[in-house]
Structure formats: C-alpha cells, structure tokens
A protein has these predicted regions:
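Glycine-rich, basic loop-to-helix element that forms the pyrophosphate-binding segment
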Residues: 65-81
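Short, well-formed alpha-helical segments that are part of the catalytic scaffolds
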Residues: 13-26
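Short beta-strand/loop segment that forms part of the nucleotide-sugar
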Residues: 30-40, 61-66, 91
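Short aromatic/hydrophobic "clamp" motif used to bind/position activated sugar donors
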Residues: 86
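Acidic helix N-cap motif at the loop->helix transition within catalytic regions
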Residues: 16-18, 41-52, 94, 98
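A conserved acidic beta->alpha catalytic loop
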Residues: 23, 37-47, 69
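Donor-binding/catalytic cores of nucleotide-activated saccharide
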Residues: 70, 91-204, 211-229
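C-terminal subregions of glycosyltransferases and related glycan-biosynthesis enzymes
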Residues: 214-255
Length: 255
C-alpha cells in the first residue's frame, strides 16, 4: 500500500497543473498522485493528465469525471485513494519537494507504531507581487515532532488558520466519518478541514514549509470581487459546518 495519496483537482488547468505535478514526482513510488480532471473542456487538461499517467504509471493515475466542482473532485480523489494518508493540492499550487519527502518518511515511521489520524505542516502564501511571502507556521500551538492529542493544543493566533493546505488525514478515517463535499460549491475546503476534527485522536505536527498557496489569478475563488459574487456559497458552507457541530455529542468528551 502507498503511504500517501495526493489528489489534484483540475478544471481547465493546463496553464499551471504541470508545475504542481512536477513538484511531487521526486517523492517516488511511495506516493500516489491522482489527477482528477473535473470535466475540463476548454483546454488540454484531460490530455495532460493522461500523458503523465502513461509516463509515470507507478505513481500517477488520471481520473476523469463530469464537472461536479472542486468538492466532487476531492470526493473522487478520496474514492480512488489507496494511500494510508490523503491530501489535496490544488492545481495552481505546489509543494516543497524536500519537505514532502521528509513528511512521507515520517509517515512511514509513524505507521510502525499505529500511525496518526492527522498530520500537519506549514504553508506559504505565495502572492503575486508581494515583497515578502507570508509563512503560516504553528510552533506556538502544536508540539513539534511528537504524537499528541487535542488536549495539548495551544491557542491559535487570530491570523492563524488550519486549512486544507496544511492537513494530511488518515484515508480510512475520512471514509469512516463519511466525508462527502457538496457538488458545484466553492469554499468547500473549509468543510474538508473541519468536519473530520471530532474523529481525530492522534495528531502530529512537523515544522516543514510544505505547501505553496498561490494567490494572484483574476478568476481565483479568493479574489475579493469573486468572493463577493459568491457570498451565497460562503453562507451555504458556513451553515453546513454549523450543522456538523450540531450533530456532535460533546457530553462524553474530555474537557
């Protein structure tokens, strides 16, 4: 079994998806890369996905589906994942290769003693035109390089966020908690990050600057004008997360 599956949701991503894929390939055959083509029709995304799958059959698989939005691409990745851990990397983002290799080595080591439910790392805001890249790290909130539970988590600063970018989840745990993101909805990465929390018992944090979160495309979901136009979808996602809280029974949880 592979140690890690990384799903790359792609929708008309020809211009940048190869940079994303190439940043992972040196991690080798312990990694499974799923390029999920979410019904791309305007460029060569499907052909690029198939070409990489043919060239690196021991690492890459191409998954083609009718357009269902980012959430359904994440769902498709999870359905097809064979790795012990699961991560999503958006097609316009990329990872630090050396950090990925070190994280995968630690995953293998952790598996020898039962593994963890959630592994966290750092991420970098890679904003076009910014003089300095903003690094999101968590040494103040999490023990470093040791297995721990929620009771040992410190306080996050107001500007610190646990997002899809810095999370690896145990694949079977995601399936056991029946994680399924809504179709044709933006900002569902918040649900991906949040919904599994009640099922997480063992965590591990590595102070690795792994994920480069690219900010700069005009059509990007985090573009201010785009976000204003999609406020209804943000409200929908927030309601879903509130419902998740309402479904949990915290009466038997340790304080």
């Amino acid at each position: 079994m592979k140690i890690l599956t990384i799903a790359i949701p792609c929708y008309n991503s020809e211009a940048y998806m190869e940079k994303c894929i190439k940043s992972m390939l040196p991690a080798g055959e312990e990694l499974e890369i799923l390029i999920v083509d979410d019904g791309s029709t305007k460029d060569r995304t499907p052909q690029i996905a198939d070409a990489y799958a043919a060239r690196y059959p021991e690492i890459i698989r191409a998954v083609h589906q009718e357009n269902g939005g980012h959430g359904e691409a994440v769902n498709a990745g999870l359905r097809n994942a064979t790795g012990r851990y699961y991560k999503v990397v958006d097609s316009d983002d990329w990872v630090n290769t050396k950090s990925l290799i070190r994280i995968m080595a630690k995953m293998k080591e952790l598996e020898e003693s039962g593994g963890v439910d959630m592994l966290l790392a750092n991420f970098v805001y890679d904003k076009v035109g910014a003089k300095h890249k903003k690094l999101m790290r968590f040494k103040n909130a999490f023990p470093v390089n040791e297995v721990f539970g929620w009771e040992r988590m410190g306080h996050l600063h107001e500007t610190q966020y646990i997002l899809m970018h810095n999370i690896f989840y145990r694949t079977q745990m995601l399936k056991d908690c029946h994680l399924e993101l809504p179709k044709h909805t933006f900002y569902v990465d918040n649900i991906f990050a949040f919904q599994p929390f009640p099922y997480v018992e063992k965590l591990y944090y590595m102070d690795e600057n792994l994920y480069h979160y690219f900010i700069g495309r005009d059509d990007q979901s985090v573009n201010e004008k785009v976000m204003i136009g999609r406020i209804d979808q943000q409200i929908r996602v927030n309601k879903i997360m509130i419902d998740v809280i309402g479904e949990q029974d915290f009466s038997t949880k340790d304080p």
